Each structure stands twice: as C-alpha cells, then as structure tokens.
Amino acid sequence: MTCKKMKLLKVYVSSTDRINHVLLYEIIAKKAKDFGIAGATAARAMLGYGPSSILRDTRFFELVEKYPVIMEMVDTPEKIDQFLEKELLPFLENQPKGCMVYTFDVDVYLAKMGDTKIKKCQCEE
C-alpha cells in the first residue's frame, strides 16, 4: 500500500474567541490558506474541557454558545513547521485567548479531489 508522509497540525480554540470581532478559528483558517497550507478544517467538538476544567457540552448549546472548536491542517512536515514558526505561533502567543496547538506525523493514503482524478502517493522512508 502506498502513502505520503505528511504532518497534521491541530489547534483547539473556543467557538466564542474573537480578535477584532472576527472568530479566531476563521482567522487561523485564513492564515493557513494565505500561507499555502494544503488543507484545513474547523469542526465543533461534542464535549471537552481545557485548563479551566470547565466541561463544555453541545447538548445545551441553546443556552451556552461556547464550545470547543478543533482546527486541523495537513501538509508536508516542512510546510507545517514553517507555518507554525513564522505565522501561527507568533500570532497565537500574542493573543489573550487560550488554545492548544500540537502536531503529529500522518500517512496520507488518498488525497482525491471531487472528480475522478486520484493522486497516488508513494511512501518516503
């Protein structure tokens, strides 16, 4: 089976975090796109807590709009490392909002656009 060695960057933020009236996860997605990161997704978490130990649950989101948002971005290890060092970490470190950022290596077995063309990946050992 063939694959491509990539890196996944995950960022956890709050759904209510804003910088100058813009949602933080939207800012992160735009920064990733502008930097040329291959792909990014923001997803609402069903349940979670962070350093505050306050458990956030979406079952009661009608009453509380605050829930965890998970940003996932994938690209080559070099591109993710450059994005972290030059763009994302300096930006987040200067913000008053809480977050968690981490990466891990992933094997991408299929990267397919919405047509019939399939990009085959070859593992790099």
Report residues per predicted region.
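Positively charged, small/polar-rich N-terminal and surface patches that mediate targeting and assembly
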Residues: M1-E125
